[in-house]
């Protein structure tokens, strides 16, 4: 990255990401059918989600082939199991853009695994090996904690899983009657920048798109979460999401507004992202991307790919806005 543009002039290509200048302000969303909405019977805990971010960071940077990566992956899988979900790991060997051989691990946790009607929520759990967007060039080879970029999406999913367990155990709450999968992508954030660099990012989701964890897996749609835990964050209707899954985008953004989080979920079309949702969409599954943009700067969050992407810069209200919106979606 050589610099950032404001949101009115960016075309973001993220596989954790490249920003390219483009013209035009975010477009107002098209008028769409109103979504029926009933408030969810449960409350998403931003404190729990924050603690899950902190726990991931406590292992150290979750870079490929590292001990921290292995230990954190084991903890994520064990935590989903503790919340009563069926968990499996999808392993695969791959090479990074520089030829480094890596062992990937996509983690899939399933609520109501026997249900045929399913949706999924996803996010990547690895962290970037280099702080190559840090103002201090001497830190460009330093691995980052990935508290927001990676950790926040996984934390939201873990808290959603905990809430689903509460619903399943409570006689007075009608738990969702649909199967829900939480997919934790690996090897998203070790790509390189350049004109033909897109395929170097999102290796875990690229692999899964060709080798789904079950042969007959055909969810109604997916929702990918990326960088959903920093301050001054907003979410636009992302271009690829609108191309492949406009009804899902509409549903989520309307529910967010009805639940009181309209100031986070901006009712306008933003930039194009090449994130984990893209290989999923291209494989035939509608999937949307909820990815954070700094409200003031119109760029990725200011801690993006810097050593400051740590637990000190996680903002609980943003975790709450995204987490409660996802909970409302699951119960509606």
Regions found by a protein language model. Give the residues of each.
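Bacterial N-terminal signal peptides that target proteins for export
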Residues: 2-11
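C-terminal motif of bacterial Sec signal peptides marking the signal peptidase cleavage site
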Residues: 18-21
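N-terminal capping segment at the start of a domain
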Residues: 26-72, 83, 298-313
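Second-shell loop/turn segments in exported
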Residues: 35-43, 58-67, 94-97, 139-151, ...
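A non-catalytic alpha/beta surface segment that caps or lines the substrate-entry region
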Residues: 51-114
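Solvent-exposed loop/turn segments at secondary-structure junctions
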Residues: 62-64, 94-95, 114-115, 125-129, ...
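Active-site-adjacent substrate-binding region
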Residues: 91-93, 101, 221, 228-332
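Acidic/histidine-rich catalytic neighborhood of metal-dependent amide-processing enzymes
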Residues: 141-247, 272
